[in-house]
Amino acid sequence: MKEKLLTLLFALIAYGSFGQDISLYQQFNGRYDFTFMGNTLNPSENNITPTCTINTSSSANLNLAPGNNIIAAYLYWAGSGTGDFDILLNGQPVTQQRNFPLSALNTDGQTRAYFSAFADVTAQVQATGNGAYTVSELDLTAWISDPLYCGIKTNFGGWAIIVFYENASLPLNQLNLYDGLEYVPTAINITLPSLNVIDNVGAK
């Protein structure tokens, strides 16, 4: 059995922080694989103009091959500030079911808040299938325009949907989904439990 892992780690450079450790959220065993899609809300590279701006929506496409049956789909979103936890996915309301707050002491000596959030959108993605997915009403404008974030290039927002699927033609796999929100100092150690890679062929 091959081992594949997926780690959702929104990383920020900082001196110290209070966040959420990376941990195992879910494991799938069988003829499974995964893909993901997502997009940023940033209209351009961070801090290239005196005033930072951000979009409140963006889109991405799902393109699964025929025969791949969706078994789970999870939406993650993240950004600067304390968070916006009620958003829309293709016009349908989505409310966070888990969230990962982070208070980071950045390199300029200022403490800033960042966040990530999670929602299970399996039913919606199964019903929609391939096509365009738009996350909207994710409004981080108040934080992005604040010089506290814009001044050190930590103004950001974005989202991703992780899609797990089954196909009888796939080899037996073990898929581990790890998530959390941590800062990245000059060095960091992250321990991933329940990970036993016996063959790196096809691992990812």
Task: Indicate where each model-derived feature is located.
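Disulfide-rich extracellular domains of secreted proteins
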Residues: G19-K204
